[in-house]
Amino acid sequence: MKKQFLSLTLITALTLGTAGTTTALAAPHSFPVISEPSTDKQVIKRIDADKIYKNIEYLSQTPRVAGTDSEYKAVQFIKKQFQSYGYKADIEEFSFLSYTDPNLVELSVAGFDGEITANHLTYSVNGDLSGEVVYAGLGTKEELEQTDVAGKIALIQRGNLTFAEKVLNAAEKGATGVILFNNADGELNGTLGEDNDKFIPSVTITNKDGEALLEKLNDGVKLTASLKIEGAHSGEKTSYNVVATKKATKNNKATKSDIIYITGHHDSVAGAPGANDDASGTSVTLELARVLKNLPTDTEIRFVTFGAEENGLLGSQHYVDNLPDDDIKRTIANFNLDMVGSKDAGDLVILTNDGEMNLVTELAQASSTRLNGEPTPYGQGGRSDHVSFAEAGIPAALFIHSPSEPWYHTPDDTIDKISKEKLQDVAEIVGTAVYDQAKIEAKKPDFNHKKGKKVKVPHLFGEKEFK
C-alpha cells in the first residue's frame, strides 16, 4: 500500500432516502443479496484466524520487494497454499523497470560553514564530480538561458516545474549536476518519475541549507561543491501474480458465469517485512480461497495475489490489461484486501476509486450489518490494486483499516503487531459478502438495509512527490 493515511472525517450518515443524492448506485445486479443467517454460517464456521496468522508469519519473515528472490519465495509459498486447497494455481510473470537506491550520497561545499545533508532523487544517476555552484532560480528554461551553468552545479529551488524538468533543463545547458532545495521546512524526498539517460547527478537539501547557500552566493562568495552518488541502478526485473480459480459448480450452460475477484498484493517495500502491508491481505485471500473451495456457487471466483503493487500497481495493471474482453464483461466485482490486520490501525473502511457506492460496497455493507449490527463506512481512495479493476469499468473496492499504524512501511511492520480479531472480522465480512452474490439460486437482491456512513479520507496516500 502506498503512503500514509490521515484521519477519517465523518461527512454524513446516509439513509435510504438520501442515498440517491449522495451515491451512485450500480446496475441492478449490484444490489446486495440479504442472506439467511444459516448461509452466513456456512462461511463463518470455516474461517480460521489462526491459519491466516500463520500464513502472515511465514510471509513476513523478510521483506518481499518486487523482483527479488524473497518475492519469488513468497510466490512459491502462495502457489503451494492454493494447491493444498485443491486449486490449480498459475504464476503469471511480467517485467518492469526498477530503480535501486544509491548506497552512498555525499555533498560538501567549500566556502560554506557547516554540514549539509543531501538526499537522492529516485532515478537520479550516479556520479562523482566537483564544480562551481551557481543559482538558477526555479530551473525554468528562461532562467537557465540567462545563467551560465555549463560545467557547473546548478542550485535550483523547488516549485512550479517537476524535478525532472528542472534537471533536464539544467542538463540541456551543460550543467554537470543539480542541487535542489526545498521551498518549505524539512527534508525533500522526491522522484524524477522514470529512467532517462539525459539525467545528471542530482540531490536534494533542506530549505534552510539552500537559503544559506544562496545567501553566500548573493554576498559574492564563490562556492565549489563536490557531489558523489554511488550504487544507483535502473534495470528490468521480473515480478509475479499468482492466480487460483474456483469454477462455478453450477450454471446455465448456455451462458458463461459471472466472475468475482478477491485480491491482495504479496510484495512489500524495501526494509519492511510487510506483515500488515500486505501479507495480511494476501493471507486473508488465501483463507477465503480455502473456505469457499467446496461451497456450491454459480459464479466463478478468482483469487489473485499481485506483485509490484508498491511500484505503482504494476501487477494488477498487467493482469487487467491482459484480460480478454469477455472476462472483463463477465466480471462483476473486485474485493481488494490491503492492510487488514494491524492491531493498532483504526477501523475498517471500504474505499472506491470514485468515492461512490457499487456492488462491492453494497454487498459488504449488507454483510457487516448482519454480522456486526452496523454497515462498514465507505469513502474515496485509490493507490491500491482495486484501481486497476475500476479503471476497466469493474465495480471494485479496497478493504483497509484507517488511520494506518505508525510502523507502516517501516522495519517494524512485523507479525507481533497483527490482530487475529481484525483478520477474522475482515474475512467474515468479505467472505459472506462474496458468497451472497456467488451462491446458487441467490435471492433476488433486496436493497432494504441500513446505509453506512460516508467518510472522507483526504489525501489518503501521500504520493511520492514530483514537484
Give the location of each predicted region.
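His/Asp/Glu-rich mid-to-C-terminal helical/loop segments that flank catalytic regions of hydrolases
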Residues: 406-467
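Extracellular/luminal Protease-associated
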Residues: 116-206
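Metal-dependent peptidase/peptidase-like ectodomains
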Residues: 297, 306-398, 402-404
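Sec-dependent N-terminal signal peptides of Gram-positive bacterial secreted proteins and lipoproteins
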Residues: 1-29
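Second-shell loop/turn segments in exported
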Residues: 38-46, 60-70, 120-124, 135, ...
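Noncatalytic luminal/extracellular "stalk/propeptide" segments of secretory-pathway proteins
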Residues: 26-38, 45-49, 54-153
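Alpha-helical metal-binding/catalytic segments enriched in His/Glu/Asp
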Residues: 82, 170-171, 178, 242, ...
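Soluble metallo-hydrolase cores and metallopeptidase-like ectodomains found primarily
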Residues: 121-141, 194-275, 290, 294, ...
